[in-house]
């Protein structure tokens, strides 16, 4: 085997009429008029190779089939004018020597039709799927993003520290993946859902600024933007307030987009309170590439003819284009799936309305038209009831309309914003108790600390913030509690006894007593961010070896049974269903 002269994608005008040696995979072979035409591919690009019948390379080239590994030596030259398509397609290699480096079985699917192949087949043969240029571009984009993150944070004085992968099971929201300890029978480690406590301990230890591309594990239901094992870009800073954290994050994200995509994100990012996001868009991660904010018409219907709205705590309306009855029925299905009892509607006709609940709104039609600005033929969609249920359901309808009419197409490619001032606590109807909205180490606004233990503790605002892009939460963080007394009040508010808190978090509570600095941080969902940056439809497209939506690795066939002897060693017995 000879040493290659370059990657295929490095060839260009400067290499014209030079002898080159290339190595890669045969994407395609064509036989035409006695000539053999090959497309040779490596990670950087594809080039056409022509083998003439009188060439000493012909016999060896005749052995080549799809996905064979080959070494080609020949002259790099322009293709005939009529065959040029721009870039590398303007050139070809006239082969003088061909060597088959390895044969290949016929692939189970055509690589150039990969996106039309069932995903389970692609995942089973992931090593072949990853040969596709689209997949290689996605993973190279990921590598560039890691480099951009590292160079920025290193320059800003952050220190990269690795935290444990085997740790203690603590309540963090999702189920833990548990690992039995062979040396301590009956006891278990947990794989980390996040490095939350360890990064706070690093601030207590005096490291001032920390970051890590952390592997995290959560045993939860999966969807397009979730995996059981995933990557967070985790960061923490000492002696900071909320604005300090947000300012660094804005510059970091702008740097990543500039270096990786050559896209300038406008700074600073707009901020919106949790209440405003929910009240106007029905989501704590609103897609702001398009507006379509709700209008509150509670007062307009109060005491009116339509009983369902007359006494409703909240009535919200969303303006939509003209809709067919079939489309309205589909949107009503979306609303019901998200907690609404139904989806009332009206269609504007002149200075009034037809359809839906039109017989109940004759007297308020002018006010509805004025307040909503609905166009002729346009549709009004209503949700009514308890505030959070109403706005959440209408928020789901808003996103369905976005997809139906491609409403985001008219906005920026990327819209980034902050959602701030989340509630510190939320009331769980099932358990009839208060619980944390983010995690129990989130600090409340200083002016709200006095509300702990009072009837108004549900009004407390957290110093928590989410970074939102195109309707996805790509990061979330908070200023942390650094005062042991405030931490005790937080545990008390969520029903954690002192004994329970000690059992779960004793090591951390001890550390808080040894001079904890004010600190705050954030974690990015790195896979989710890369999904958005690359335009992929799923985070599985930006992860080299992902699980499917059932949490299975179809290539490695994991999870899988293990030997009884292995289970016995760690004291585990599998029960039947």
Swiss-Prot record:
L-aspartate binds at residues 172, 218, 438, 480. GO terms for cellular component: cytoplasm. Its main location: cytoplasm. Gene3D superfamilies: Bira Bifunctional Protein, Domain 2 (3.30.930.10), GAD-like domain (3.30.1360.30), Nucleic acid-binding proteins (2.40.50.140). It comes from the Bacteria. Its EC number is 6.1.1.12. It holds the Pfam family tRNA_anti-codon. It catalyses: tRNA(Asp) + L-aspartate + ATP = L-aspartyl-tRNA(Asp) + AMP + diphosphate. ATP binds at residues 218-220, 227, 473, 525-528. Residues 196-199 are annotated as: Aspartate. Keywords: Aminoacyl-tRNA synthetase, ATP-binding, Cytoplasm, Ligase, Nucleotide-binding, Protein biosynthesis. One of its GO terms (molecular function) is ATP binding. Homodimer. Belongs to the class-II aminoacyl-tRNA synthetase family. Type 1 subfamily. This is Aspartate--tRNA(Asp) ligase. It comes from Deinococcus radiodurans (strain ATCC 13939 / DSM 20539 / JCM 16871 / CCUG 27074 / LMG 4051 / NBRC 15346 / NCIMB 9279 / VKM B-1422 / R1). The gene is aspS1.
């Amino acid at each position: 085997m000879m040493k290659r002269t370059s990657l295929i994608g490095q060839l260009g005008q400067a290499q014209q009429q030079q002898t080159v040696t290339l190595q890669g995979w045969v994407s395609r072979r064509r036989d035409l008029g006695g000539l053999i035409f090959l497309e040779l591919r490596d990670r950087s690009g594809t080039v056409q190779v022509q083998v003439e019948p009188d060439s000493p390379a012909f016999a060896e080239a005749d052995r080549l089939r799809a996905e064979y590994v080959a070494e080609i030596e020949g002259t790099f030259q322009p293709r005939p004018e009529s065959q040029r398509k721009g870039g590398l397609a303007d050139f070809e290699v006239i082969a003088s020597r061909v060597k088959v480096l390895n044969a290949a079985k016929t692939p189970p699917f055509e690589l150039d039709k990969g996106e039309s192949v069932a995903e389970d087949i692609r995942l089973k043969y992931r090593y072949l799927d990853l040969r596709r240029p689209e997949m290689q571009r996605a993973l190279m984009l990921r590598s560039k993003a890691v480099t951009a993150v590292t160079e920025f944070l290193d320059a800003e004085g952050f220190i990269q520290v690795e935290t444990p992968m085997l740790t203690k099971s603590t309540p963090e929201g999702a189920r833990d993946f548990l690992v039995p300890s062979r040396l301590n029978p009956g006891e278990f480690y947990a794989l980390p859902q996040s490095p939350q406590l360890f990064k706070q301990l690093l601030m207590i230890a005096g490291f001032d600024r920390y970051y890590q591309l952390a592997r995290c594990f959560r045993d939860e239901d999966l969807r397009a933007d979730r995996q059981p094992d995933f990557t967070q870009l985790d960061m923490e800073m000492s002696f900071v307030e909320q604005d300090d954290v947000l300012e660094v994050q804005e510059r970091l994200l702008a740097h990543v987009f500039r270096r990786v995509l050559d896209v300038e994100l406008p700074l600073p990012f707009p901020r919106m309170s949790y209440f405003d996001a929910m009240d106007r868009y029905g989501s704590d991660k609103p897609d702001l590439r398009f507006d379509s904010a709700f209008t509150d018409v509670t007062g307009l219907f109060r005491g009116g003819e339509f009983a369902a709205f007359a006494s409703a705590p909240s009535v919200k309306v969303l303006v939509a284009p003209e809709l067919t009855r079939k489309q309205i029925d589909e949107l009503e299905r979306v609303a019901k799936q998200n907690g609404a009892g139904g989806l009332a509607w009206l269609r504007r006709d002149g200075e009034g309305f037809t359809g839906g609940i039109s017989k109940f709104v004759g007297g308020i039609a002018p006010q509805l038209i004025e307040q909503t600005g609905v166009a002729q033929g346009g549709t009004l969609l209503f949700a009514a009831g308890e505030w959070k249920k109403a706005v959440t359901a209408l928020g789901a309808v808003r996103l369905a309309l976005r997809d139906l009419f491609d409403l985001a197409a008219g906005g920026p490619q990327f819209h980034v914003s902050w959602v701030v001032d989340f509630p510190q606590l939320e009331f769980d109807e099932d358990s009839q108790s208060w619980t944390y909205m983010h995690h129990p180490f989130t600090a409340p606004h200083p002016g709200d600390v006095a509300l702990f233990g009072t009837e108004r503790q549900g009004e407390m605002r957290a110093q928590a913030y989410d970074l939102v892009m195109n309707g996805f939460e790509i990061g979330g963080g908070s200023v942390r509690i650094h005062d042991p007394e405030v931490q005790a009040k937080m545990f008390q508010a969520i029903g954690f006894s002192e004994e329970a808190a000690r059992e779960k978090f004793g090591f951390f509570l001890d550390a808080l007593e040894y001079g904890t600095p004010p600190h705050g941080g954030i974690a990015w969902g790195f896979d989710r961010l890369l999904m958005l940056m690359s335009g992929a439809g799923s985070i599985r497209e930006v992860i080299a070896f992902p699980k499917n939506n059932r949490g299975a690795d179809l290539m490695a066939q994991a999870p899988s049974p293990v030997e009884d002897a292995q289970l016995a060693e760690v004291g585990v017995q599998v029960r039947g269903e």
